[in-house]
């Protein structure tokens, strides 16, 4: 009786762990932001609200205080999102993903007496590129966050918004950054997994794959239409390999020549 080839699996746990690691940094930066805001900017806003005229907008001093506070937040962000931490976070993610996929595809190959992971000359360069790209994604989250909170604070001060209203917007901004981190975690897990799977499948002589979705409510219609259909690695569908489309959790099941 022929042995059944283990299915290609999507590593949800790796994606969740990566998202949590990035969100830990975001939460830390969010706490620092609110602390500096409460201590240095809130008093300036309350001082202005207590005045009857608009002299606040005619004076440079209060805005200078705000600028210094924003600069403090930016400086502290460099300690939280320092290059070593960012690199370590990206590296841990990519290495965990590689280990997961390597074990998964090796088990598929064993059914046919093949081990595609014995020699992988492409892997080192692929890993370095993936780690570098993800380090950039993490840094970009920080940069976008800082640009947005600076805009929120200055707009609030100039428009005469209450300290609470501005603070609420800062809290909301943290939530937006967290959602961005979750998107990147799933998106990158799928993309890197799809490319690793394709390389390892081709390494063991597999030229075709069957598209398989995660079979849940999040699957988009275009991917449901591809499910269980067989494609050539040399000529994949227009959306690319399983996992390459944005936030895709689909996988490629190997189709061996004797099937």
What is the predicted role of each segment?
Residues 1-176, 256-259:
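N-terminal leader/targeting and assembly helices and adjacent pre-domain segments
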Residues 172-259:
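Acidic, glycine-rich two-metal-ion catalytic cores of nucleic acid-processing enzymes
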């Amino acid at each position: 009786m022929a042995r059944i080839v283990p299915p290609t699996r999507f590593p949800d746990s790796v994606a969740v762990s990566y998202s949590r690691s990035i969100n830990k940094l975001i939460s830390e930066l969010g706490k620092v932001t609110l602390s500096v805001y409460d201590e240095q900017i809130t008093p300036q806003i309350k001082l202005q609200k207590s005045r009857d005229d608009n002299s606040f907008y005619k004076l440079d001093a209060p805005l200078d205080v705000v600028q210094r506070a924003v600069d403090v937040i930016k400086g502290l962000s460099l300690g939280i999102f320092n290059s070593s931490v960012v690199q370590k976070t990206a590296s841990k993610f990519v290495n965990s993903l590689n280990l997961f996929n390597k074990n998964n595809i090796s088990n598929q190959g064993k059914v046919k007496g093949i081990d595609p992971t014995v020699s992988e000359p492409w892997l080192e360069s692929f890993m370095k590129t993936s780690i570098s790209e993800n380090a950039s994604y993490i840094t970009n989250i920080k940069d976008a966050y800082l640009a947005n909170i600076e805009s929120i604070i200055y707009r609030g001060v100039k428009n005469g918004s209450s300290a609470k209203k501005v603070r609420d917007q800062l809290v909301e901004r943290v939530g937006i950054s967290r959602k961005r981190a979750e998107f990147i975690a799933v998106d990158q897990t799928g993309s890197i997994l799809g490319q690793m799977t394709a390389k390892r499948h081709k390494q063991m002589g597999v030229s075709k794959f069957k598209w398989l979705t995660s079979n849940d409510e999040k699957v988009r219609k275009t991917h449901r239409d591809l499910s269980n259909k067989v494609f050539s690695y040399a000529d994949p569908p227009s959306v690319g390999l399983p996992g390459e489309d944005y936030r895709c959790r689909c996988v490629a099941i190997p189709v061996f020549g004797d099937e």
